Amino acid sequence: MINNKTVAEGRYYIGLMSGTSADGIDLALVDFTDKGQQPRLVASFYQSYSAIIADKITSLYQPGSNEIDRAFHLDVELAQLFSQAINALLNQEKLTPEDIIAIGNHGQTIRHRPSGDNPFTLQIGCCQTLATLTGIRVVGQFRRKDMALGGQGAPLVPIFHQQLFTQTTAANFVVNIGGIANITFLPTRDSNQAVLGFDTGPGNALLDDWFTKHHPNSDDCFDKNGAWATTGQVIPLLLEQLMQDDYINSAAPKSTGREYFHLEWLEQQLTAFKEATHSQHETVINHNADIQATLLAFTAQSISDAIMALTAQGKVYLCGGGVHNKALVEALSSRLTASDTVFEINTMQALNIDGDILEAMAFAWLAYAFDQGLDSNLPAVTGASASCTLGSAFLP
């Protein structure tokens, strides 16, 4: 535990999350003062990104020209936006920087390469700039020590989910459907199974990319409620091809990101599919909405297959932006309640937890764990060689 005057005087932690969907900044104001109790969400705040900022972020998901300059100019620019959002939250709650123990800053992932030689991960949104502009200590760079210990550096949220389900008598899954989808498996208390978690594949990423490409003048950058997808028909042969992807079929521990599942990846898949079906004199893609319907089925199947590979029954709690895609939730629910499986499906709201802010709460907890000297990774999840306290501190 650190010995710092700021820690002694403050009461709350702020968790900051900017996800791979690149839609905005999520903030969670969290109280951990009741030892042994679940963390209490005091307030939340959301600030959407402008189209210009979102484009700057997504353009860095793939290698390109002048990317070092672009990345580190954006590193500072995002920190400035983060600080504005923090100040807006403080004003909303009539708090001052002295009321905050620390900010747990995930930042914005622009590249995540956990495999191969010299694996690395890069999150921008400069912690030092954020600390200086807000006058609040920042804990960030949470993924790097886990990777230094041979882990994937992701996912990090399962250990926080474990804190929320301490009294579970049934197997529970937390399914976060962001740009990338990930699951946490929380076995029953009397089970000898370990908590597991991994990225299953694309969540909203490909759905958003394909929608935006074909609706450039839409006010939305996503397929609201999956409405467009529902006008199309799933293409079974294309779905089968997508499900054969190497990442989908790789074993955990594993993690991925937008540098893998992106529009260019999809275009390559479609080109290969059209060539294969053309050689068989088949025409199976009639409308772009058919591809959207197939992508929705791909997300639902990759998630459901991962869940059913671990157990045949349990409770599934959904969170993340994908929860608001009605068609996607229905497709996932249909798969999990078919055949011989017995799953009860809810959103995190059933537990009185705002699923939209859950990841931000997790990074508030990671900052708290840093201050308490608690282990905050799960080697069974990330593949790290040891448990450790994650993060680094940046003083104002």
Curated annotation (Swiss-Prot):
NCBIfam families from the UniProt entry: PRK09585.1-3 (NF007139)
InterPro entries: Anhydro_N_Ac-Mur_kinase, ATPase_NBD
Transmembrane is among the record's keywords: no
UniProt protein name: Anhydro-N-acetylmuramic acid kinase
Catalytic activity as recorded in UniProt: 1,6-anhydro-N-acetyl-beta-muramate + ATP + H2O = N-acetyl-D-muramate 6-phosphate + ADP + H(+)
UniProt xrefs under PANTHER family: ANHYDRO-N-ACETYLMURAMIC ACID KINASE (PTHR30605:SF0)
GO BP term, pick one: 1,6-anhydro-N-acetyl-beta-muramic acid catabolic process
GO terms assigned for molecular function: ATP binding; kinase activity; phosphotransferase activity, alcohol group as acceptor
Gene encoding the protein: anmK
Function: Catalyzes the specific phosphorylation of 1,6-anhydro-N-acetylmuramic acid (anhMurNAc) with the simultaneous cleavage of the 1,6-anhydro ring, generating MurNAc-6-P. Is required for the utilization of anhMurNAc either imported from the medium or derived from its own cell wall murein, and thus plays a role in cell wall recycling.
Sites where the protein binds ATP: G19, T20, S21, A22, D23, G24, I25, D26
Membrane spanning residue stretches: none
Similarity comment: family membership: Belongs to the anhydro-N-acetylmuramic acid kinase family.
Taxonomic classification: Bacteria, Pseudomonadati, Pseudomonadota, Gammaproteobacteria, Alteromonadales
Pfam families membership: AnmK (PF03702)
Record EC number: 2.7.1.170
